[in-house]
């Protein structure tokens, strides 16, 4: 493997040198690398190495813009070749490995000389070889200082010709760009053209067909008091032409007197087809405004966007604005915005739904205090009267049964004494009556007897009532299909 690499390097270097000798002074950017390769090859073959290389200096001066190619972005092939030589030589003997390493170390010393900056090389060539070009050295130094000063604000552009097959190391590429005048620079700071950032507007502004028209004497004041995030949904008309009413999705009437409100309603009914409205009234006018709206709604002349709102109530106004934004965003998805037939329907549905929810919240959240008081008082009175009646009944029944028992006992004793000659029949009669009264002494038994008698009497009365009703139905000429409905009517 070592011999194969040596032969390959030797053939490539000899071919490059032959092409250089034939072409004369014209050379490429890879000539310095081939010079280093030639030096390494001579050391490995044992030939004499010149103290100074004139080919390196001449080839460095002959670098042109057309010689820069694709090889500027990858690593130098010489490093891979040397690493391959080192790895392959480990398989050979130790003596051969040491000799090769010594030769490579000598070649690397010459390779380091290649990484010298252009300024150092020019100074060495001017002093050692006597080129006699002080003006060239001076011009090169001035170019280097100028490029170093503009390096931070410049953009380097490399012309890609695709004519080079090898690659340069990144350090070598940087030295070339900073040392010669081949790099094409364009300073962004000195450029006459400048990029202007356009102003971007992120605010959403709905079209006129999706806005609410504010009318009335206090319309300007009302529009100024609207928060900024909701102000874009409202518009003030510059003219008092009622024909503009049809161009808006709804009308907000801000009034101070009821006469003005009625006049605006008449104009809306005359020039529009049930345009949705929002009445904004003053404190104390809400009930009368509702009565006026009821008369218009009964005739199906207008559509109510939102219930009347007092201008001084901030919470109600905030709810109105949120409700308006919600409906406008909902109507944006409709295909035909100007034809408000479907829009009016959706608005009426939303308004009715809002009213129902409002009523549910009012009834569910705050129950009537009078209603709860009446229920409490009724239940307490019923329980109290029932307990009192039950206690009174039990006490009175106990007393009555006690008196009756004592009275019947005395009568039985007297009857048995006075009528002692009557025999066993009178005694047995008094004994049976006494036992019957004793069986009724218990409080629980008395209660059960009372309940049974009450139920029996109630059943008798209910049965008599239904019997009279059925008798009346039979006597009246009613069809059999309608007898059930007639019975229900009579019961109600």
Swiss-Prot record:
Keyword Mitochondrion carried by entry: yes
Entry's Gene Ontology BP terms: autophagy
Disulfide bonds listed in the record: none
Compositional bias of kind Basic residues: 356-365
Coiled coil spans: none
Tree of life domain: Eukaryota
Keyword S-adenosyl-L-methionine applies: no
Amino acid composition bias (Polar residues), ranges on this chain: 10-26
Residue ranges of the TM segments: 374-390
Bias-annotated ranges (Low complexity): 342-351
Cellular location(s): Mitochondrion outer membrane; Vacuole membrane; Preautophagosomal structure membrane
Chain intervals for the UniProt region annotation (Disordered): 1-97, 122-157, 342-368
Membrane topology: Single-pass membrane protein
UniProt KW keywords: Autophagy, Membrane, Mitochondrion, Mitochondrion outer membrane, Transmembrane, Transmembrane helix, Vacuole
GO CC terms of this entry: mitochondrial outer membrane; phagophore assembly site membrane; vacuolar membrane
Family to which this protein belongs: Belongs to the ATG32 family.
Entry function: Mitophagy-specific receptor that recruits the autophagic machinery to mitochondria and regulates selective degradation of mitochondria. Mitophagy contributes to regulate mitochondrial quantity and quality by eliminating the mitochondria to a basal level to fulfill cellular energy requirements and preventing excess ROS production. Recruits ATG11 to the surface of mitochondria. Also promotes autophagy-dependent peroxisome degradation.
The protein's name: Autophagy-related protein 32
